[in-house]
Swiss-Prot record:
GO terms for molecular function: structural constituent of ribosome. One of its GO terms (biological process) is translation. This is Small ribosomal subunit protein bS21. The keyword Zinc-finger does not apply.
């Protein structure tokens, strides 16, 4: 879990909040929370994963054809 520790000379709340938000984003806490908000069947997860892989592949092929 991300956490921000302030030094003795750091009393600025805005800087601490910005650092905390950056750590939360880097750790992927919000995306994980959204993903776990509702139960998703394993079959649906597999379908989404397969569709994402296909989309990445088509994007890669399209990019190679442009170059």
């Amino acid at each position: 879990m991300p956490g921000v520790y302030l030094n003795d000379d750091e009393y600025n709340f805005d800087i601490a909040l910005r650092r905390f938000k950056k750590q939360v984003e880097k750790a992927g806490v919000l995306s994980e929370m959204k993903k776990r908000q509702h139960y998703e069947k394993p079959s649906v997860m597999r379908k989404k994963k397969k569709a994402a892989a296909r989309k990445r592949l088509l994007k890669k092929i399209r990019k190679m054809n442009m170059a």
